[in-house]
């Protein structure tokens, strides 16, 4: 009788997001800052979609290149790579982007047929400036955002899950 009163579980597609939003901040104009980070994303058989979002803002990049040079693009850059399982350092990345000037927000979408099961590595290496000058108009901060979002089926149990919460189907199989 009590079982009949229980609401049915609801299957939803839920996004799981990985990545970074970073703003460079240094004390002087002559110091660049290095930033690197990486994270592992588990692709199991339930992942149905991958969306990568990337944007870089490198203010005054063309003017500074003329002033101090950046022929090899080593002074200010954002380099992002997504590696499939077991391919890092022995093959080309699944996806990559490199910005040495402003890079408008771009979304890259991949479907299930593009995926190999296992642990994927999202890696970023960047170098930039972040200057707060006494005069606001002379201040600038390099900035980038990169996110990889996977979509997986998730079950919401109304009796135990709060709104927006659910359990990934792949976690129920373990």
Predicted features and spans:
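Extracytoplasmic/lumenal soluble domains of exported proteins with redox or metal-associated functions
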Residues: 32-36, 103-109, 147
């Amino acid at each position: 009788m009590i079982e009949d009163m229980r609401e049915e579980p609801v299957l939803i597609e839920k996004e799981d997001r990985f990545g970074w939003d970073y703003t460079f901040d240094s004390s002087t104009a002559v110091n660049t800052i290095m930033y690197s980070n990486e994270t592992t994303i588990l692709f199991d058989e339930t992942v149905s979609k991958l969306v990568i979002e990337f944007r870089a803002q490198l203010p005054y990049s063309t003017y500074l290149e003329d002033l101090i040079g950046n022929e090899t693009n080593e002074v200010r850059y954002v380099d992002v790579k997504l590696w499939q399982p077991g391919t890092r350092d022995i093959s080309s990345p699944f996806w990559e982007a490199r910005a040495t000037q402003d890079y408008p927000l771009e979304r890259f979408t991949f479907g299930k047929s593009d995926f190999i099961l296992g642990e994927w590595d999202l890696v970023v290496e960047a170098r930039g400036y972040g200057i707060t000058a006494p005069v606001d108009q002379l201040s600038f901060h390099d900035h980038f955002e990169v996110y990889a979002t996977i979509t997986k089926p998730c079950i919401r149990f109304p009796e135990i899950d709060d709104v927006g919460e659910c359990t990934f189907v792949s976690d129920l199989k373990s």
